[in-house]
Swiss-Prot record:
Keywords: Acetylation. Transmembrane segments: none annotated. This is Uncharacterized protein At5g48480. GO terms for cellular component: cytosol. The keyword Acetylation applies. The modification N-acetylalanine is found at residue 2. SUPFAM superfamilies: Glyoxalase/Bleomycin resistance protein/Dihydroxybiphenyl dioxygenase. Homodimer. It comes from Arabidopsis thaliana.
Length: 166
């Protein structure tokens, strides 16, 4: 969905010219350790059922027989997409494992317990949900091998007089 009506004014000597700035895409970008994109993609496919929609490879290899390393990969998960990228391709950036990065994703599910179990089977570490998080509707939490925290929430069904079956 594009963002509209963001206006910028430019002059070229003849007077102001109005242009509209439109954003066509917004994606999360998750940085992982050098040459770990393939491992991350495998984990996210296994743990969460992510679907890879595209990737780019390192342009150079040491040997022709060597498998190329994945530089970045776009994954689709629960109607959203995010890019997993090799941190070595972006000087000055750090990975989610870096201290204080605080990268967290929230996934809505009908069965948080099963989601936690599947993520742990794929290599994540279970993290206890705090009392405050439970009050927010969070039912499970894991940290993946790449330092990202994943919170699982179960959607609550609120029954009111308006939507109550008779």
């Amino acid at each position: 969905m594009a963002q509209e009506d963001v206006t910028a004014v430019a002059t070229n000597g003849a007077g102001p010219v109005e242009t509209h700035l439109v954003f066509t895409e917004f994606k999360q970008m998750l940085l992982v350790e050098a040459q770990k994109v393939g491992d991350a993609v495998t984990f996210y496919k296994s743990a969460f059922g992510a679907i890879e929609s595209g990737h780019s490879l390192y342009p150079k290899r040491k040997l022709d027989q060597e498998l190329p390393h994945v530089l970045s990969s776009e994954l689709n998960l629960a109607g959203s997409s995010f890019v997993v990228c090799d941190v070595s391709s972006l000087p000055g950036f750090s990975t989610a494992k870096s201290e204080g990065s605080g990268v967290t994703f929230l996934l809505g599910t009908k069965d948080a317990e099963a989601a936690v179990a599947k993520a742990v089977d794929a290599g994540a570490v279970k993290v206890e949900v705090t009392e405050a998080e439970v009050e927010l509707g969070f039912k499970g939490k894991v940290t993946d091998p790449f330092g990202v925290t994943w919170i699982f929430a179960e959607k609550k069904t609120v029954i009111t007089d308006e939507n109550k079956e008779v």
